[in-house]
């Protein structure tokens, strides 16, 4: 919390073993609202390249960023396109929750393998979901920006209200639409059992 929910890269390094194959990141993050900085992502990319690791990068909240923060996809960094699975979807930025349409960008050999699994696991997304998603991606306009402004207004109000409650605190999230409340000052005793 004290570092804005940035990854502790020394801890990441300490956890890598010869059996480590991948690192999973979520930025903006659920549930903290943290957004990994470009500096952290560059250093993580160096770690991934040096240790021949794949990165699974969940970027479903990429459009929900506040206060001048910038989303950087780790796949855009040198040496990372060929080792990154970028996961995204329509549910968050385009308010299509429950429609179950997502997408992945990854090296071609992995996409081909995914297609073999997918073609026998899923029939297809409903036609209206495909059409709505194409329209959202191709004609994105003021709707997403208006939604982000409204989320920011709600976030600011909720953070202020939470931080005014004795014993509660929270940082102002930089992305997504979650608030991670610190309850460490509340002393809750263990329930007694008969």
Regions found by a protein language model. Give the residues of each.
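Residue-level detector of conserved catalytic or cofactor/ligand-binding positions
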Residues: 183-194
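Glycine/threonine-rich helix-loop capping motifs at alpha-helix boundaries
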Residues: 119-126, 168-169
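Active-site phosphate-binding strand-loop segment of PLP-dependent enzymes
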Residues: 2-67
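Generic structural signal for small/hydrophobic residues in well-ordered secondary structure
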Residues: 23, 30, 58, 74, ...
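A generic structural signal for well-ordered alpha-helical segments
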Residues: 48, 162-163
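Conserved glycine-rich beta-strand-loop-beta hairpin in the small C-terminal domain of fold type I
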Residues: 134, 150-159, 170-183
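Structural signature of PLP-dependent enzymes
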Residues: 114-118, 137-159
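Active-site PLP attachment segment
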Residues: 77-113, 125-128
């Amino acid at each position: 919390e004290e570092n804005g929910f940035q990854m502790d890269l020394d801890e990441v390094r300490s956890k890598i073993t010869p059996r480590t194959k991948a690192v999973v990141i979520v930025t903006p993050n659920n549930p903290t609202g943290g957004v990994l900085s470009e500096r952290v992502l560059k250093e993580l990319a160096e770690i991934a390249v040096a240790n021949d690791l794949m990165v699974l990068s969940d970027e479903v909240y990429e459009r929900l960023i506040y206060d001048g923060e910038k989303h950087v996809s780790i796949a855009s960094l040198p040496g990372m396109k060929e080792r990154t699975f970028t996961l995204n979807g329509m549910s968050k930025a385009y308010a299509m929750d429950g429609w179950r349409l997502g997408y992945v960008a990854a090296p071609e050999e992995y996409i081909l393998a995914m297609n073999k699994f997918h073609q026998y696991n899923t029939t297809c997304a409903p036609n209206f979901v495909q059409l709505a998603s194409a329209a959202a991606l191709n004609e994105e306009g003021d709707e997403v920006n208006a939604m982000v402004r409204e989320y920011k207004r709600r976030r600011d109000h909720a953070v202020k209200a939470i931080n005014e409650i004795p014993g509660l605190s929270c940082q102002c999230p930089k992305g997504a639409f979650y608030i991670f409340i610190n309850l460490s000052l509340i002393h809750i005793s263990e329930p007694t059992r008969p």
